[in-house]
């Protein structure tokens, strides 16, 4: 089984969006591994665990092919773990991009 964390932060990410405490300022300054997105993981390239608002960013940063995703396990319905609006673009009949012939 292949398991990869895509995001490991709390509901607002890290550093916090509107915070200027010393910890958030330090994280902003250092960047890299000090910047964390909302919680998400992927199993075997075809099952997502949670679907946060950062899913699109996770795809871009990792370069992963999310067209292989077939399942999504939502751990709970809080808005930091489940933002279903992007799922609309995966529905049949929604063509926001070029589709390949089957």
Residue positions per predicted region:
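Cofactor-binding loop segments of dinucleotide-utilizing enzymes, especially the Rossmann-like FAD-
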Residues: 8
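Arg/Lys-rich, low-complexity, intrinsically disordered N-terminal tails that contact nucleic acids
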Residues: 11-13
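Pre-active-site segment of Zn-dependent metallo-hydrolases
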Residues: 15-73, 77, 83-94
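Short internal beta-strands
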Residues: 97-102
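Extreme N-terminal starter segment of soluble prokaryotic enzymes
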Residues: 1-4
């Amino acid at each position: 089984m292949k398991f990869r964390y895509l995001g490991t932060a709390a509901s607002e990410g890290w550093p916090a969006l509107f915070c200027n405490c010393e910890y958030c300022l330090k994280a902003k300054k250092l960047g890299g591994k000090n910047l964390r997105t909302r919680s998400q993981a992927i199993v075997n390239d075809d099952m997502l665990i949670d679907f946060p608002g950062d899913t699109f960013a996770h795809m871009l940063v990792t370069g992963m092919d999310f067209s292989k995703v077939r399942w999504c396990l939502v751990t709970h319905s809080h808005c930091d773990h489940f933002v279903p609006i992007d799922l609309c673009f995966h529905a049949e009949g929604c063509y926001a991009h070029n589709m390949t012939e089957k």
